[in-house]
Amino acid sequence: MANELNSLDIQEILSLLPHRYPMLLVDRVIDFTPGKSLHAIKNVTINEPIFTGHFPNQPIFPGVLILEAMAQATGLLGFKTVENRSENELYLFAAVDNARFKKPVLPGDTMHLHVEFLKERRNLWKFAAEAKVDGKLVCSAEIMCARREF
């Protein structure tokens, strides 16, 4: 079949990322190309624990959690890129540059996370990342992850 997508369901995501509720911020991977790019989604619901305090009468998904969701997507791309990875391997959020927040993310939104691998040097991986809602850019950043064994 031409143009078949490489996708990951929640069970596959749980097998790759160490994050768990309430910090697992990727619900599904729609498509990925190892060593190149990944497209994932995060469904934002009013049931997110953060909305009890951010903000009680005007819930807005925090920008730092948008960045974390994009970082988790980069970790998934890293794990799917490296062959023969160690069971004790993690991708740690190492840096964020040029972060820009364009629109708020609200309960009911589906964030589409797009990450693109840029380069790797000495186990530091650099990615371009974007989050979109309804096709509109809500956040963009360059993210660096450190590949480490524990």
UniProtKB/Swiss-Prot annotation:
Q: Which GO terms describe its molecular function?
A: (3R)-hydroxyacyl-[acyl-carrier-protein] dehydratase activity
Q: What is its EC number?
A: 4.2.1.59
Q: Where is the active site?
A: H54
Q: What is its main location?
A: cytoplasm
* Pfam families tied to this protein: FabA
Q: Which GO terms describe its biological process?
A: fatty acid biosynthetic process; lipid A biosynthetic process
**InterPro entries registered for this protein in UniProt:** FabA_FabZ, FabZ, HotDog_dom_sf
Cellular component GO terms, alphabetical: cytoplasm; membrane
Enumerate the UniProt keywords alphabetically. Answer: Cytoplasm, Lipid A biosynthesis, Lipid biosynthesis, Lipid metabolism, Lyase
| Catalytic activity of the protein | a (3R)-hydroxyacyl-[ACP] = a (2E)-enoyl-[ACP] + H2O
The keyword Lipid biosynthesis is assigned to this record: yes
Compartmental location = Cytoplasm
- Return the SUPFAM superfamilies for the record: Thioesterase/thiol ester dehydrase-isomerase
Describe the family membership recorded for this protein in Swiss-Prot or TrEMBL.
Answer: Belongs to the thioester dehydratase family. FabZ subfamily.
For this protein, the record's NCBIfam families field holds: fabZ, PRK00006.1
State the function annotated in the UniProt record.
Involved in unsaturated fatty acids biosynthesis. Catalyzes the dehydration of short chain beta-hydroxyacyl-ACPs and long chain saturated and unsaturated beta-hydroxyacyl-ACPs.
- Protein name stated in the entry: 3-hydroxyacyl-[acyl-carrier-protein] dehydratase FabZ
